[in-house]
């Protein structure tokens, strides 16, 4: 295993160096083509930064990903589908970063990318084994997989509101999945190669994106979410529900934050994906934490979920599950008392009570 760890470290280091260097070029390109994130004072907008910032960071991550693949990847139909799908995601995001496009146009790009993974790559969520029972999805496997990939593609972009937040959360995810793959002896698996290459790529980006950020991921944060979705589906090819459970639990923070954001907006009569300033990180900022400390707190929570995942998968399922429940209750209590059910939102609280009475 020591040899595999050293080999994996080499992949991460080389892609990290390339990513860190390419980000310098991406800043200049972004300025040249006017792909800048300009702060605005519009009500409900989630901008925190005060100055215009280049936003092609995710393009740099994609280029580092390609570089890592050329050095360490192996050609296959699955890998080809991932490259094609990723290119579609990045191309869509570049267009949106230069001149914002409509939501349905972006969604069309995401659907096409997901379709490439499913129909060309053959990566499909076609069954699930849980509690000793096997459930076949049949033709429903196609819409289920499509929905899952599109959801993952957007989840990172939705929580990308602070310097270093998306890059750090994604790095924790890729590191955790890589550790699981190595510990289980899957040294030549596509999951491990993808995780290591993406870990180096996101860490190189994080070097420039951590507060104070000199470059943002831009709409290309969808690329990181897309790869996370693909890796999760590949992991799900394992023998049981645990294969799906691990990557989902590592993403507990963005999943819970996004879920409650959608509920909050629907209860307010807003569009579910409309930007606002009531995400978990906004609540921490409202408690007078600095932007850097807010991100570090979220890192810590995510790392604790990651540790619980590693214990659950590799050591003791009971202890891992207990840790999950404790962490989930803590996060749930915080979110409910700061974002949805809160004295800050008395009208919203009345709406919730009214809906509960009707039901």
Predicted regions, residues:
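Membrane-interface capping segments at transmembrane-helix boundaries
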Residues: 25-32, 334-351
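Alpha-helical transmembrane segments of multi-pass membrane transporters/translocases
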Residues: 14-19, 304-310
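"…together with the soluble PPM/PP2C metallo-phosphatase catalytic core" -> "…together
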Residues: 1-258
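Cytosolic, membrane-interface loops and tails of multi-pass inner-membrane proteins
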Residues: 25-54, 260-292, 352, 356-359
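Extracellular/periplasmic helix-loop-helix junctions in multi-pass membrane proteins
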Residues: 307-325
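N-terminal hydrophobic signal/anchor transmembrane helix of membrane proteins
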Residues: 237-240, 326-343
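Alpha-helical transmembrane segments of integral membrane proteins
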Residues: 286-304, 313
